[in-house]
Amino acid sequence: MAQQIQAIRGMNDVLPAHISAWQHLEACAREVAGSYGYEEIRVPLIEHTELFKRAIGEFTDVVEKEMYTFTDQGGESLTLRPEATAGIVRAAISNGLLRGARHKLWCIGPMFRHERPQKGRYRQFYQLDVEAIGFAGPDVDAELIALTARLWRRLQLSGIRLEINSLGTPEARRVYREILVAYFRRHESALDADSRRRLEGNPLRILDSKNPQMAQVIAAAPLLTDHLDEPSRAHFAELAGALDRMGIAYRVNPRLVRGLDYYSRTVFEWLTDALGAQDAVCSGGRYDGLIAQLGGEVTPAVGFALGIERVVDLLVQAARVPAPAAADVYVIVNGAQSGAVLHMAEELRDALPHRRFEFNLGGGNFKAQFRRADKSGALLALICGDEELARGVVAMKPLREETGQTECPQAELAARLEELLVRLTSRRSG
C-alpha cells in the first residue's frame, strides 16, 4: 500500500459533518452585509510580495516572519495573501473603482500565515472582510461596528464584547512613537527579546505583548490617547457618541493597537472569553493613508476582518449550528430498470427543484437499500420495483412515522409527493 499523504500542518480539512456551521455563518454574513449595501468582491489568493511589504509594513511580524513567499518560474516574488485588505485596495486601484466613487465591499476566503498552529490560529484560515472605501466620517466607523453587532445577533451569539481606541494621525503617532521608544529604552531590561527587536521597527506592538512578565512596564507606559491631535479626538468622540445612541456597549482600551502598520484613527476589536488565548474574533479600523501608499489617490477607508474558524467554534459551543439538510426523498430501485428510474428522478427534480432527492446508487438488495434510506434521514422512500413500474405506479413509504406505504400513478407523482412531503415536514417541525 502506498504511503498516505497528510494535510500540511496548520491547514485543516472542513468535512461534510462540520460544513453546516460554515454555511450558516457565510449565509448570515452575506445577508447582513447586503442589508447595509455592501457588495461582494473576489480577489486573488496570490499577489506580488511588494504589495504586502508596502501595505502591512516591513517591520511587522506578518512580513518579517509569517508570509508564505516564493519566487515563480518567471523570477517574480509572490506571496500567498496573509490578509485581504491590501488585495481589495489593490483591486480597487487597478480596476479604476475609485475614480470619483465610493464603494462598500466584502469578501470571504482563505488567508495564509506561517504561525505556530494552535486552536483558533492556523496557517490557512478563513476571514470575512468588510471594507468601506471613500468614506471619511466617524459615521461609517459606527456603521461597521453596528454591522458586526447585528451579525452577532443574527447568529444568536452572546458574550462578545467590544473594545475601541484611536491611533490618531500618522503625524501624532510619530510624536508618540518617539515618546514611547524613550520610555521603553529606560526600561529595556524588562523587555523580552521580541519586544527589544520591535523597539527599532514597530514599538507600538510592544503594547500588545501577552508576556505576563512585561505587564507592569506596559501598564505604566505613556498613553497614545494623551497625545492625539484634536481632529482625531473629535472623530473618536463622535464615534463613541454614535455607539452610545445605538445602544452598543464598548470599552475604551488605550492599549489597543493593530498589528498592521496601515491603521490610523479608529481601531476596534470584538473579544470573547470562550476561546481561551485566541480571544479576538473580529478586528478592524481606519486606514486613510493606505490607498495613496499603494499608488492611488488619497482616499479614506475603514474595514474589519472576522475570523471564520473562531466564530464557527462559538456557534458550535453555543449549539447554534443548524442541522445538516437531509434528503427529502430516497429513491429505491427494486429491480433491473435503474435507467428508467433515474429518468423519473430527474423529472421529479425538474418538477420539485426545492426538494432533495437521493438516488440509491451502486445496487444492493431491497433490504440493504431500505437501510440506506433510513440512514439518509429522508422523510420518504420511493420504491420503484419492476412490478410497480409495469403497472405505471410507484410506492411511497414514510420513513419517520408508522404509516403504511401507498401507491401513486406516475403521472400524478410530483403533485402527490409534494402534498405528502408538506404534511410530513409540518409534523416533524411540530
Which sequence ranges carry the predicted segments?
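TRNA-recognition modules of translation machinery and tRNA-sensing kinases, especially anticodon-binding
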Residues: 1-428
